[in-house]
């Protein structure tokens, strides 16, 4: 990690300290002289620059967004500018280990969930592969302040004020960009694992990525499957639909995986959010359409249900959880809507790690 940090700073010199103006302060200032007046005006300008946002800064662009002092950043304007110019290619190169990147997409209201997920990832020794795709500037600055190089923002930034609910227009806008992000990483030549941050790792998932398939994914249906179930894409139901989750995906940089991401993006672009279909207004239906339309061209692999259970099974069938104890790898806190309800459920099941184990996260305690 130390070597990575050194490389990062060699490529992009950062400084969180204000520029020194000692040479100015040592110069004589004569009252009413032209030079003295200019220096007084310069000092006033610098003073205002420290305490007021400059035009075009995130603070001015989003005056109501930085409302939580707990996520305020101490980065200097220069450092913020450097992180705004940080590219996905730079970020992926920095975090990739053995050609693999682990990606999540986060807006600032979900920083506690990011931290909770990171604790679980760190326990499996895979945190250095993590790249946080920040959906707002608060997240970009906070993550890179605490953990330099591990967050990147791909413009445009989304509204950072709201924790989007499943089915809302904001949630649709948030998730609709996902296949493009993943495709860009594949085009750079990396394997990529995507996770939602309302997940917790209980074991190392990489040992379950058997073979060399193009794409790996999980079933979102809560109906119990046999332990030795097929790893093929499930057959569509009577409505012609499959219910694969877009929450946990692993992709290799193959033509098949790239084709799947392109088709997913096309399906998303062909649908628009509306109130009448708001409970389907997320990227998952489009992902399933893309899977079914490319199934004969892409090498697909359905991951084990017992290892990667949907929240509709794990949190609703205590008997099954007991029978399969020790076999669970990643638990997804879905089949529930609402930030507070998700947090309470994690707490009820002993999976909310932030309160007692924050120091195990690369971000530490978020303040």
From Swiss-Prot:
Residues 57-367 are lumenal. Residues 1-35 are cytoplasmic. Its cofactor is Mn(2+); Mg(2+). Expressed in roots, rosette leaves, stems and flowers. Residues 1-21 are annotated as: Disordered. InterPro entries: Nucl-diP-sugar_transferase (IPR005069), Nucleotide-diphossugar_trans (IPR029044), UDP-D-xylose:L-fucose_XylT (IPR052636). A motif (DXD motif) lies at residues 196-198. The keyword Metal-binding does not apply. Glycans are attached at residues 85, 98, 173, 228, 292. The keyword Transferase applies. It comes from the Eukaryota. One of its GO terms (cellular component) is Golgi membrane. Disruption phenotype: No visible phenotype under normal growth conditions. It is a single-pass type II membrane protein. It is found in: Golgi apparatus membrane. Its main location: Golgi. Optimum pH is 7.0. Residues 12-21 have a biased composition (Low complexity). Its EC number is 2.4.2.-. Residues 1-10 have a biased composition (Polar residues). One of its GO terms (molecular function) is UDP-xylosyltransferase activity. Belongs to the glycosyltransferase 77 family. The conserved DXD motif is involved in enzyme activity. PANTHER family: UDP-D-XYLOSE:L-FUCOSE ALPHA-1,3-D-XYLOSYLTRANSFERASE-RELATED. This is UDP-D-xylose:L-fucose alpha-1,3-D-xylosyltransferase. It comes from Arabidopsis thaliana (Mouse-ear cress).
